[in-house]
Amino acid sequence: EFFPGVEGWFERINAYGASIGVAVEHYIISSGLKEIIEGSSIAKAFAGIFAASFVYDANERPIWPATAVNYTAKTQYLFRINKGILDITNDEDLNDYTPEEKRRVPFPNMIYIGDGLTDVPCMKMVRQKGGSSIALHSGTDTRLTDQMILVNRADYATQADYRPGSELDETVRMQLHYIR
């Protein structure tokens, strides 16, 4: 089950970005299973899906982990997005030096939205490199997200509510104006 408003989020934010001259792309970096994300109703909204996956046998049964994505492994995918090297088997180009002006998605143009502890390293890195990070909480317990603000892991903390007019919606729109 998705957070409220997720299914309409991508199209709406893309349209808003286009209205102010910002091309918006969405990527997901997840410790969850890629196959589950790819089978979801929102999969088509992502320019890239980076998640754990399996190797399958001839009967399409999972037989071995192909890719494991933990909290520290997530950061490499930010560099893949940054450099435009989305093929996870292409480590050579990923590790080659790329001048900042030739990077496809500069870090200051990134908005990282995280909803769990495995997102903390990515939120911190994006923030340190000039982008913005938003820590999400669900329910009324804001202790973790408040702490992320206090220790400079995130710029903003909001309810995991993607509906129009929500605090998250308004925060992302504001960040898109800064990027513009």
Language-model features: where?
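C-terminal cap/substrate-recognition subdomain and adjoining C-terminal extension
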Residues: 3-180
